[in-house]
Amino acid sequence: MKYTELVPHETKKRLRDRIGSVLLTLTAPQVVLDPLHRPGEYVFPWLSLCLASGGNREYLNLSFEKRQTAAGQDYHRLHIIASDDPSCEHGTHREYPYDTRYPAVLMDIGARITDVHFLTHTAINNETGEEIEEESTLILHLDNGVCLHIVPQFLGDFVTTEYMVLRIIPA
């Protein structure tokens, strides 16, 4: 296994262009699926980032989409929808509309993004030798020393692309 940066170029560029922006808030429906989650870990079907730069606000809705290789192997890729519409902060999402059964969670951050990294966990199919992207990770470094890791949620042997884990790594 190796870790490589295999997130599509346009997604990387969209987020790297946000370096220097202030991450104001994180919004998501309050969903915790895994009873073994650790302190500082939160499980959501989608996550919205509210960013401020030069007096403008932007909302990035993040989720994971399921894709298939030519050989039919499933893998997961980070999917981002950008908007300047404030309603996006409260759950509007093309693939995962807001579910009123789960109240939104709002975390005030107020820290500047200093760096953005992408890691993709790549496995080798033993039968074909084909490389398969299994777990994309987005890492946001903030100027207060905190790192935010956003990864797909794995539930035992079952993988769902409809949920993600937010890990807050303190300074």
Residue ranges of predicted features:
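Surface-exposed, interaction-prone regions used to assemble/regulate multi-protein complexes
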Residues: M1-A171
